[in-house]
């Protein structure tokens, strides 16, 4: 049912790493400002603790990479669905190439990997790309938990 892009433990063993360039930094900055009010980027463990763990509403966390085709397919659809929920759920975007410590802390070995947090606890998740109906069901389950 769930398809995953298996990349091995590319963070923990430094097998693959993308170095930010001026072009990708500018892309990230532009994309950052295109998020809706319910979507934000996470760049550090401190940021994660403040915006995800301490959040009073459920937060969906999207571990992704700029070079990942499935991530590029999932990310905008997930953003659109979360933005359509008028703040009842938030979306935190974590670029694994810029926040490797968080990726290692959560055992990310494939991207995209998505987790849901509620009241500071991880409650569910998936790896790979889901269709629109599956995404809607996932968000509904997060809200109902």
Swiss-Prot record:
The record marks 62 as: Deprotonates C-terminal active site Cys. It holds the Pfam family Thioredoxin. CDD domains: TRX_family (cd02947). GO terms for biological process: cell redox homeostasis. Keywords: Disulfide bond, Electron transport, Redox-active center, Transport. InterPro entries: Thioredoxin-like_sf, Thioredoxin_CS, Thioredoxin_domain. One of its GO terms (cellular component) is mitochondrion. Transmembrane segments: none annotated. The record marks 69-70 as: Contributes to redox potential value. Disulfide bonds join 68-71. Residues 39-144 form the Thioredoxin domain. The active site is at 68 (nucleophile), 71 (nucleophile). Gene3D superfamilies: Glutaredoxin. Belongs to the thioredoxin family. PANTHER family: THIOREDOXIN, MITOCHONDRIAL. Participates in various redox reactions through the reversible oxidation of its active center dithiol to a disulfide and catalyzes dithiol-disulfide exchange reactions. This is Probable thioredoxin-2. It comes from Caenorhabditis elegans. The gene is trx-2.
